[in-house]
Amino acid sequence: EIIFNGDLVNRKPPHQRARSGIGYVPQGREIIPYLTVEENLQLGLEALPGGLAKHKKIDELVYELFPVLKQFLDRKGGDLSGGQQQQLAIARALLGKPKLLLLDEPTEGIQPNIVQDIESAVKRIISETGVGVLLVEQHLHFVRQADRYYAMQRGGIVANGPTSELSKAVVEKFLSV
């Protein structure tokens, strides 16, 4: 069971999870490739009460976090690079005004300079919006920016604690290949 704000959410359909305050960016991004950047962003507004009919304006914060999106509003999502698609997916999730943002491997397969942009954006999201972030990530330098860590093997938690206490032994035992 997954309970968020006292509400059982794991059996709810995605749109109800979004309306309950959870933003989700899946591994692999899952943007809509045949929609424009702007249309993909508008989908994020659907999570708000009243949906797109009531909320038509894209929050400027997403363009501050990911300036490339403003330049490519008319471009199809499928024409963006992988890193740009990831930025679009995170921005779309943010537009639903989540209380919790779930990011599943947001830097997987992304070129290093875009990884830095995404890391910087996530830091800003945490510090400026009050949104909680649950990050599934393999890049240890990014993980170390979190408050807590959980190491998993075969779907179970095998180690956890404050990230400041993430030891070399734990890294070698559970996080090394």
Model features per residue range: what roles?
Residues 1-20, 49, 163:
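ABC ATPase NBD Q-loop/coupling interface
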Residues 12, 37-57, 65-67, 161:
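ABC-type ATPase nucleotide-binding domains, specifically the catalytic core motifs of the NBD
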Residues 76-80, 84:
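Conserved ABC ATPase signature
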Residues 93-94:
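ABC ATPase C-loop
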Residues 97:
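Conserved catalytic motifs of ABC-family nucleotide-binding domains
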Residues 101-105:
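Catalytic Walker B motif of ABC-type/P-loop ATPase nucleotide-binding domains
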Residues 116-129:
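Helical segment within the ABC ATPase nucleotide-binding domain
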Residues 149-161:
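H-loop (His-switch) and adjacent beta-strand-loop-beta switch element
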